[in-house]
Structures are given as C-alpha cells and as structure tokens.
Regions:
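Small beta-barrel nucleic-acid-binding modules, primarily SNase/OB-fold domains
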Residues: 1-136
Length: 136
C-alpha cells in the first residue's frame, strides 16, 4: 500500500491493489484517537505530526483489525522503511490518546503512560483534547 493523503491525526488515505485492481481506501489508525481538526490546535498538531512521520506515496505495511462504523479499515500502520508504528509514535508523542477497546495492545498502554508522565502534548494541560471521543 502507498499513502495518498493524511486526513487528520488518525486517518489516512492509501492505494492498495486488490485482485489486480488498484483502489483508494481510508485507513483509521487502530487503538488510538487523535483530537479532531475542529478541536483547534491539538487536532492540527496531530495531523501535522503524522505528516512528518509519513510522506505522500510512501510505502506502508498494515495489520488489519476490521472496520469502524464509518466503513474505514482499522489498521496498525507501519512505515516499510523502518517498520515504525505510526499509532504508537502518535501516542508516545502526546498527539493521540489510547482508544479504549478490548483488543488494545499493551504497547499502547505503555506509550500513553510514558506520554502522561512526561506531560507530552495533549497531556500538558487538561481538556477535551485528551478525550476526542467525548468531544464528538
């Protein structure tokens, strides 16, 4: 797959080939929730940070985890150049919160604990930017 667009701090667009046919898909980064763009500076910061981690047309590897209620593919997204996990980097940097669900991986809990302890990003001051699901 290849990145085509970064919509916000936890959603990207990508080209994939399925059955020999290319198609555009939306991927929602699994296990995390970044502030919404409409939430102001933290939503914009999350998107900007994600754009620094991955450039347009860059090759990505994905581990699929189903679909969300909007029909987006839920996936852990890795850069193929170094297999860096984008969701973990967003959480560790304080640009996204852990999305609480039964399948959340321990590494995400650890990354959020580190970000909170460092008061990184969204954890620097309290507010709805720490809980995007409540904002929606």
């Amino acid at each position: 797959m290849r990145l085509t667009y970064t919509y916000d701090g936890d959603t990207i667009g990508a080209w994939r080939t399925l059955g020999g046919q290319p198609e555009q898909v939306k991927l929602r980064l699994a296990f995390i929730d970044a502030p919404e763009i409409a939430q102001g500076s933290w939503g914009l910061r999350a998107r900007s940070y994600l754009r620094t981690l991955l450039y347009v047309n860059e090759s990505i590897a994905v581990n699929f985890h189903g679909y969300d209620k909007y029909g987006r593919l839920l996936a852990e997204v890795l850069r193929t150049r170094d297999y860096g996990n984008l969701g973990l980097r967003l959480v560790l940097g304080g640009y996204a919160a852990l999305w609480m669900c039964p399948s959340t991986q321990p590494a995400y809990h650890a990354a959020q604990a580190i970000a909170k302890a460092k008061r990184a990003g969204i954890w620097a001051s309290p507010g709805l930017h720490q809980t995007p699901w409540l904002y929606r």
